[in-house]
Regions:
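Glycine/serine-rich anion-binding loops at beta->alpha junctions
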Residues: 1-11, 190-197
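Phosphate-handling active-site elements
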Residues: 14, 18, 181, 205-219
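Conserved phosphate/ATP/ADP-binding segment of small-molecule kinases
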Residues: 100-179
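Charged C-terminal helix
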Residues: 213-245
Length: 245
């Protein structure tokens, strides 16, 4: 889970991952108990140290826990705007991070400051519905939520678990020009951070020079293969089995 899992996934897919912490989590397969946000200064130092040291072909953004960290990320991505950027939009756990922190403020800052610089945002349909019910995004229909995210300037949005024909679930890609493409959902048993693995796989394809639709198509193929390799190591949720044995 988290950065170690992404690093293993990248290595298996033939990419060398470098990482920047945004928070340390006390966590097991059942859930998250505590989050300690990394200071934005440390996050900035680590990111720029790596970016100045070696060529980076693509970036994936995961959870951010303070608006200051979002601001730092926006400055970094603006300085390295030629690097493809994937933003994995996630729900902030219902934990007390800081008395002055509002999770909705972090998401709004991410929408306003970072999405305009992103090539792709990956988000689950259920999360979009939650944000709409809380007023973070307008309306109650999927198209309205997609339009709202695209209005922030992101080039494309990939929605997982989107409703299709009948009871079918799909992955829906919508770009800034209104062009849409659908794939069958990955399927399989529920797994922790399934969308995170998908976003990582897509990022590795962008790093190889693929355009967003092709990267999504190949990333979904990788995710489907990984969905056949899951296990339950503890008392909580299933996770991907990233070992080769």
């Amino acid at each position: 889970m988290g950065l170690p899992a992404d690093a293993i996934t990248c290595a298996e897919l033939g990419c060398h991952a470098i990482s920047v912490l945004t928070g340390t989590l006390v966590q097991d397969t059942a859930g998250i108990e505590h989050i300690e946000a990394i200071t934005p200064e440390l996050m900035d130092d680590q990111a720029r140290c790596l970016l100045e040291d070696m060529p980076v072909q693509a970036m994936k953004v995961g959870p951010l826990y303070t608006t200051e960290s979002v601001s730092v990320l926006a400055q970094i991505t603006a300085d390295y705007s030629d690097i493809p950027l994937v933003v994995h939009l996630q729900r902030t756990p219902d934990l007390p991070l800081d008395d002055d922190l509002d999770a909705d403020d972090c998401h709004t800052a991410l929408f306003e400051l970072v999405l305009a610089q992103a090539d792709l945002a990956v988000v689950g349909h259920t999360l979009l519905q939650q944000w709409q019910s809380h007023g973070l995004l307008p309306g109650s229909k999927l198209d309205t939520a997609l339009d709202a995210l695209l209005d922030y300037g992101v080039n494309a949005v990939l929605v997982t678990g989107a409703p299709g024909a009948g009871n079918e679930l799909t992955c829906l890609l919508r770009d800034e020009h209104g062009q849409s493409r659908r794939w069958p959902a990955v399927g399989g048993a529920p797994v922790v951070d399934a969308d995170g693995l998908l976003a990582t796989a897509i990022t590795t394809e962008l790093a190889r020079g693929a355009e967003v639709p092709d990267a999504v198509d190949r990333g979904l193929g990788i995710a489907r293969a990984m969905a056949q390799r899951v296990f339950q190591p503890g008392m909580g949720s299933r996770i991907f089995n990233r070992s080769r044995s």
